[in-house]
Amino acid sequence: MPKQKTHRASAKRFKRTANGGLKRHHAYTGHRFHGKTKKQRRHLRKAAMVSASDLKRIKQMLSQMR
């Protein structure tokens, strides 16, 4: 049986936290900022946590990552 491998695209996009959660970056941060308020842009800079409904699936993709 072959070994399960880490999904490399996901490994580049998520970071594990000390308590076992996953940090992610916000979407909509590449361009077209003229339609967003300063408050929206400021909040988009901060990292967000992966929601509980997605956590199980993403953790399986990152099963070999420490």
From Swiss-Prot:
The keyword Ribonucleoprotein is assigned to this record: yes
PROSITE patterns registered for this protein in UniProt: RIBOSOMAL_L35
Superkingdom in the source lineage: Bacteria
InterPro entries per record: Ribosomal_bL35 (IPR001706), Ribosomal_bL35-like (IPR021137), Ribosomal_bL35_CS (IPR018265), Ribosomal_bL35_sf (IPR037229)
Molecular functions (GO terms): structural constituent of ribosome
Keywords, in A-Z order: Ribonucleoprotein, Ribosomal protein
Entry annotated with the keyword Transcription: no
A Pfam family annotated for this UniProt entry: Ribosomal_L35p
Region listing for Disordered, in residue ranges: 1-42
One annotated Gene Ontology cellular component of this protein: cytosolic large ribosomal subunit
HAMAP family recorded: Ribosomal_bL35
The protein's name: Large ribosomal subunit protein bL35
Source species taxonomy: Bacteria, Bacillati, Bacillota, Bacilli, Lactobacillales
Gene field: rpmI
